Every structure is written in C-alpha cells, then in structure tokens.
Amino acid sequence: MNKYIQEVRRRSQTLLIVEGNHEKNDLFWLIFKCFPELNIDMENVWIYGTNIYQFYDDIEKEYGENWDEEDVDIDLPYVVSRKKTPDNLRYKNDFTNIILVFDYERHDTFFSKSKIAMMQKRFSDMTDMGKLYINYPMIESYQHLKTIPDADYKDRKIPVLLQPGKRYKELVRKESVIQPHVYFPHKLDDLLDKHFQITDLGIRQACCEDILNFSDRQHMDERLDQVLQNIPEDPRKKTLKFQLKHWIDRANYANEGKTYWQYMRDLFVKIIYYNVCKASNIQKGVYLIKSEQYRESFESLDPGIILDKQNKLSNTDAGYIWVLNTSVFIVAEYNFSLVEKFGITATGDDLQRQGRNSCEGDGRCEDALA
C-alpha cells in the first residue's frame, strides 16, 4: 500500500479514551450503532481502566510536575499506549480527533479540585491534545431520567454523601426509564445463549440483529417464525417465540413503527437535549431552551464554569452534585444537525408532546423486560 495513503487513513481516525467497560461496551457501542455517521471504530475506543485523578498522575510522571504549562504539548495516545500496550505505541499524530470521557467521582479518595480543573482546562480541543467530557457524578447519569418527558430533571441532584459509586448506580437502576432499553440487546443475547442454549455465535447474532430490526408489530408472528427457522429444533422454541414477542412489545420500538436502532436514536436525541438544558441551567440559570436557541445554547456551554460550580456546590458533606452527562454531547459536537432531526429540534412543547408517546402513560419504558 502507498505509504501516503496509509498515513491519510490513520490520520482520519478518532480516538476515544474512556474510564471503563460500561462506557465502551454499553454506551458508546450503542451510540455508534445508532449514529453511524460518527464513523468511530470500536478498536479506537481505549479503556483506561482507572479514574481521572490517576490519569493526571500518569501525565505528570511522563511530562513532569509543570506539564500544565501552556507550552507543554501533551501526547495522550502515547501516555495511554505506553502504559497499556508498550509494544504498540501510538501517537496523537495518528488521530484527527481525541476524546476523553471520565467521571467526576467526588467520592474518590484521590479527588482533587485542582487536578480535575487542570484536566478540564488543558484538554479542551479534540483536534489538538484532546477534549475532556466529565460526567456528574458518573457515566450512568445519561440513564437518570425517570420518565420521558421528565419535568424534574432540571432539579435532579445527589447528596455528596451518596457514596461509594455503586450506591449511585443502584439508584439509577431503580429510577431509570432509560436503562432497560440500553441493555435490551445484551439481555436478548443472554436469553438466547444462557436460557435457550443457542451457543452458535453466528446464529445467535443473526437472530438478535433480525429482532432488533423489527419495525412492524402487525406482522410480528410471521417475522419471529422466520427468525426462529434458523434455530435448531427444540421443544422450547414455542416458549421462546412467546417470550420474544413479549419482550419486543415491552421494549416498544416496533409499536412505534421503528427498529430498535431508530427508537434508541430518537431516545438519545432526547437525552442529549435534556442534558444540554441541564448544563445551561447550571452555567447560566436558563433551563428550557427554545428550538431557535438550541444550537447557540449548546455552543455557549463552558465545561470549566460548570465544573467550578459543581466543585463549589459539593464542597462540604452537606453539599450536592447536579446530575449531568456531557459524554452524550459528542454526537452534537460531531454534527449538530444529528440532534435536530427529531421533530422540530426535540425542544420545548415538541419534546413534551412526542415524549408522551413512548415513555409515559402506559408504563412500557418503566417495565420493559420486567
């Protein structure tokens, strides 16, 4: 292959450095499936495996204690690959965009306001050294909507003393209207694998993909019969068909004439809107954003101001943290038109009206897969 062509191909890549498995294998796997326009290779989603405060220390070890000075050029792909894959070093020149996604983790023993503030300040441009997206209090905050629409999201916060992190995860598990939908593909695979012993990976994946692409509830029986033809004969096949039909009905996507991916894409657009509104409220005291102001409001968000306010509000044991997910902003950052395609712009009365059709009233979202 021509060396120049190979270099162009490598430079067109986007690198995503995340904290843990959930970010890569649940959230961003799903986002990339729902928004293929992002064109990010899952191989370029690197799991760092520890928190932002350890990341700060690793950068300091590599570049010295004055690494935060403006003239120090930080090569994050090198820092991470040197630690995780020393036999396969990578450099920032290999990538066009570098994105970091980490949790706020106020509860962590090594929490440091100065360290996280410096990380937010230094990593503000994905086309240069990288851009940091902080989730408050943790990555699971993107799931922390109780209904769609959720009028209370504006004021959703957690006490500083809600520690350790697994307590927040448990709270989200109990309250989230989003979580059952996020895990639906994984639960579907587990059902076929562990409960019905469909161990052939190719057959199982084909079945899951077909089911996730259903969009017509009226012909559900015929479609399921076609899918199950590929499964070896088993006396439990009839039971499996009825269980799948129930799950698909509760997941609600086919009821709306959408595939699972279309349904989740629309749901993510709503999640993004709610979090843009929340970030705007934290920063400027303005929550409900009208359609004509949506892009401007998003582009005026300042992660440094938001972090500073979160630090001040959570400074004592009596304090609190606003629930906010900024990692979903990656979609809007890539191409804002992707979040404008739902309804008008998924804002105001339009969001309220369309939201009621999917996740409120009949309990489908709350009880999906129950």
Predicted segments, located by residue:
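C-terminal accessory helical subdomains adjacent to catalytic cores in phosphodiester-
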Residues: N2-R11, N25, W29-W46, Y56-E60, ...
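Charged, often glycine-rich, active-site loop that binds/positions anionic groups
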Residues: N51-Y78
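Conserved beta-strand elements of the Class I
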Residues: T14-I17
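Short acidic, Gly/Ser-rich segments with clustered Asp/Glu that frequently serve as metal-coordination loops
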Residues: G20-K24
